[in-house]
Structures are given as C-alpha cells and as structure tokens.
Amino acid sequence: MKYIGAHVSAAGGLANAAIRAAEIDATAFALFTKNQRQWRAAPLTTQTIDEFKAACEKYHYTSAQILPHDSYLINLGHPVTEALEKSRDAFIDEMQRCEQLGLSLLNFHPGSHLMQISEEDCLARIAESINIALDKTQGVTAVIENTAGQGSNLGFKFEHLAAIIDGVEDKSRVGVCIDTCHAFAAGYDLRTPAECEKTFADFARIVGFKYLRGMHLNDAKSTFGSRVDRHHSLGEGNIGHDAFRWIMQNDRFDGIPLILETINPDIWAEEIAWLKAQQTEKAVA
C-alpha cells in the first residue's frame, strides 16, 4: 500500500499538521516538530504531545506514515568542532522530540564539508553524529536524504549514502529518503521508465532497498545534472509525469511515506489524487 502526502504546516500546534494532511486526503505527511530555522525550541508539553497523538489517531496516521524533518541549520559533518557539537546537540534534541511524539523516523540532510575537510572525513563525521544520536535515543530511525549537491553539500551520490550507512553501528536504525528532484539534479535520470529502472537498479546495488524509508516526490525546475535544488509541481518540471507514475506502480515503494514538497500547496490535494489514481494501472514488477 502506498502512503501518499505532503509536507504540511504545523503552525498553531503540531496536531494541526495531521488535520491539514487529512484535509487534502493524504495518507502520509511530513512536518517540522519545531521551527526549522532556529536552533532552540521550547520543550514539548504534555498537552502538545497528547493533542498530536490524538489527532494522528483520529485521522488514522501511524508512525510509518509520518516523516518528520529536522532543522535546516544542522550540519552533522561540520568541519569545525564547536559547530559540529552544536549540530549534534540539536539533532539529538530533534530525535528526542520524535521519540516523545511516538514518531519512528527523522529525515535530515546529511551535511556539508564547507571546502575545509575532505569528503571522506565529512562522511565519517556524519556517521559518527548519527551513532551519537542513536546511542542517546530509542525507537527513532535516522533517515538520510539525498541532496542535489549544491555548494559543498554531500549526499548527492548514492555512494555517499552507502558510506554513511557503512559507518553507522546500528544498521536497524538508519535509512534513506530519496528526493526525486535532488536525484535528477545530481545526475540520476528519471525522465523515462527505462531511466527510472536504471537509476533504482543503481540504488539497489549501491545502497539497497531495505534502507529506503521514505521519498520526496518533486518535479524539478532545475535541469538534469545541474546540482541545483529547485522543486516544481508534478509534471510541470524537467522530470515529467512518467517517473511518478512508475513509482506509483512499483511495489518496492509500498509502506513508506511518499511526500510532496512541490511548490504549490493549493494543488497538493489534486497531486495526491493523481498519484493515487496511477496505482490502478498495470503494476511494474
């Protein structure tokens, strides 16, 4: 079964994220559990936690259908020790918030070397950051998102994701989220079913589908291989409809949150309905 939704606002209270997801007939959703552009947030209150859990129960969202995202400020591969420690503390806090809310996944961007250390050193720092966070939490899986490779961001190659996973001690609590726009911008073609087959065969060989814990379904304003992260509405960008139809008809993407981060929230309900409709076509093996 496909879990299809969008990254919805939690403005006014975390419970509102579940309500907003239900309003667009989503069967999954993503959210920030705190302001994504600030380092610190007030601790979650018992009332906030209870209201969120009650809303999820009311609208039938389990933890398998919810993909929280961490703060954009966090860089788990930071080359400077003091800044790295600050990011690690913030990431642990994000993991603990998920733990309190009964959520089992936390999606994050891996990190950037800032042109100050090697890719290998940065990837090792990211893996160690994950190890530290996993050691201090329970029940939450760290879900590494592939990137478009803008600037000095790592995670744009499947090999980067594999290297991070290789350095994580508890393999049962690490996974990946593949963003289609990021993959396309990083040079993984998705414009035809044949290209989708090739890209995900590479993913299966290098990373492994057992680690796929979520996806971001975004078309791309950015061009192929441009290393530029610019999302677009489904079918309106340079990827086109075929990739998303292919994903919907492929059972390897069942049982994980498939999340829209497309640019027009006003048509999310339409995009979700379109994605759901594609499942009725002939299934892809």
Curated annotation (Swiss-Prot):
Cofactor note: Binds 3 Zn(2+) ions.
EC number in record: 3.1.21.2
Molecular function (Gene Ontology), one example: deoxyribonuclease IV (phage-T4-induced) activity
Enzyme class, broadest EC rank: hydrolase
Gene3D superfamilies to which the protein is assigned, alphabetical: Divalent-metal-dependent TIM barrel enzymes
Cofactor(s), by name: Zn(2+)
Binding annotation for Zn(2+) 1: 69, 109, 145
Pfam families: AP_endonuc_2 (PF01261)
Residues holding Zn(2+) 3: 182, 229, 231
Residues reported in the UniProt entry to bind Zn(2+) 2: 145, 179, 216, 261
Domain of life: Bacteria
Keyword list, A-Z: DNA damage, DNA repair, Endonuclease, Hydrolase, Metal-binding, Nuclease, Zinc
UniProt xrefs under InterPro entries: AP_endonuc_2, AP_endonuc_F2_Zn_BS, Xyl_isomerase-like_sf, Xyl_isomerase-like_TIM-brl
Cell membrane in keyword set: no
Presence of keyword Zinc-finger: no
Protein task: Endonuclease IV plays a role in DNA repair. It cleaves phosphodiester bonds at apurinic or apyrimidinic (AP) sites, generating a 3'-hydroxyl group and a 5'-terminal sugar phosphate.
Family from the record: Belongs to the AP endonuclease 2 family.
Protein name: Probable endonuclease 4
